[in-house]
Amino acid sequence: LAHQVLHAKKMQSEGKEFKPIYGIEAYFIDSVTKWKEEYEEVQKTKKNRKKEGMSLAIEDETATKRQEKNILNRRAHLVILAQNQKGLSNLFQLVSKSFHPDNFYRYPRMDYEMLAEHNEGLIVSSACMGGPLSKCYWNNREEGNETVQKAMVDTVERFQSIFGDRFYCELQWNSIPEQHEINKNIIEAAGKTNCRMVSTADSHYPTPDTFKDRELYKQLGWLGASKPDYAEDILPQRREDLKYELYPKNGDEMWESYKNYSKQCEVNYDDELVRESIKETYRIAHERIDNYYPDNTVRLPDFVVPDGSTANQELDRLCDEGLREYGFNSKSDYVERIKQELQVIKDRGFSKYFLTMKAVSDEAKKTQLVGAGRGSAAGSLVAYVLGITGIDPLKYGLLFSRFLRKDATDYPDIDYDVSDPMKLKEFLIKKWGENTVVPISNFNTLQLRSLIKDISKFYGVDFTEVNKVTSVMIKEATPAAKKAHG
């Protein structure tokens, strides 16, 4: 995400005809188990080489640092596309497993064993210059073409044994000389293994003319980091200055890139093979990938509903207990309010959601302090008598409709504070399982005010001057930015 400024909304605003496909570019290694064994051995070696002296830990790095670095970086990129609904499910499984503590170190990792277990419905290609076939070139080029070819053929056959004809060798076109050495070796290995090829373009921005935006955005990421100060001339000023073009291309544009870069690098290819690889890319998208959508159905836990009961019945029972506990069962206004709220909750099918939130709240209270709740959930009498919140909405004149409307389709937010969120998360995982408890992910966007200041810093504009005009710039730029980027 750090250098990615392309998404479907921008593609649509540019008037592009395209088909979005669910997939990932994963970090792949041959064997997570073997990698872990080697890594643990390196860590043991490092530990044994540390010597205590003068209250300092002195380390002899000469025999371990390079080896450790190689092990940490022993990974390759792999493009994995979901072919159908089953494939999407398997893709989710792979991503989840790659983030498991057993497979995660700095990066999520997956290996042949994981791919074999969840291969159904997936299409895989060998990715870019950081892919597994490219690694065969980088790791063996000093030993000659024969060694490179053997490694590539072995790797292709290993993937074919898992995915069959759903594995593709991937070609890319740019002005980097090594890319063409890799391409030639991939073409040779694909011929030996009867593996189909695709031509692809790494895509990081929507149109050719927006490369400056991406390059500037990339440089902003280094502001304040331990990198040398960048001057304005670090940014490429012309498309011709780029070693590679990172925007989506149609078939004609891919062919043009191939012809231009192969001529520029003085490399001869079989035109028919390349033309077929471009067509194959189209076939994958429009013939091999089904039209499907992620199943966004919310699946709440069943254990909150006792055997022989329904979610509605259990919610009624708990609310009745809560009314009696607080002494509200004899107060007509409270009884009427609880009936109204329960009717809305049941009509929307949210009973199990409230039972789940009560279960989480109850578990939290066993180990730590829990706040009274905040936000519109404080307007729910049901939440109060269940013990989810600690505020009586009738006492303070709080409206249930601010929390949950009769026509609501999404679950309402119920926010409450706990003294130790991480401890609660660990407790819930231990009680209910790591496959059923996940934190919420947040994606933050750059705000215009901070973006103006970062860009000004990059160009060396004094902050006092920037502050004088920031408000005016925001007022003038916001409408245009929203129109351009959504």
Question: Over which residues does each language-model region extend?
Answer:
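Alpha-helical scaffold/interaction cores of sigma-54-like transcription cofactors
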Residues: 1-486
